[in-house]
Amino acid sequence: MRLLLAFTAALVLAGAAASATVKPPVIKYRDDRFGPILATPKKQALYYWTKENDFRIHCKGGCARLWPPLVVRSKAAVRVHVAGINGTFGTIRRPDGRLQLTFDRRPVYTYVHEGPTQVLCDDVNGWFVVRLRG
């Protein structure tokens, strides 16, 4: 019985340590024009599309090739809150079965023709860079 309890405690501690070391798939980045924005760890700006206001995925096929979704491996890899970022993270299942990151209930995307630190498509055809409060 003691061995079982010790083993269970070790598993719990290992799980807690593993989840504590999971790096968030996003960072807060300060853009000269837009102020604090949400970006990938490689400083690629993240966008949302105003046509996706019903918590359903509408950007698929050719749209998703131009606007690649920020996909995550599992819900467990996503923290609901990330230090220094005001807002709530979550996931939504895409039509292909992959999980896409959401921020304040909106699926987030990158733009394929942008490099790190670029913001080229804010307010273009309903796409907006994710601006952060504070």
What positions do the PLM features span?
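Compact beta-sheet-dominated domain cores in extracellular/mature segments
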Residues: 19-134
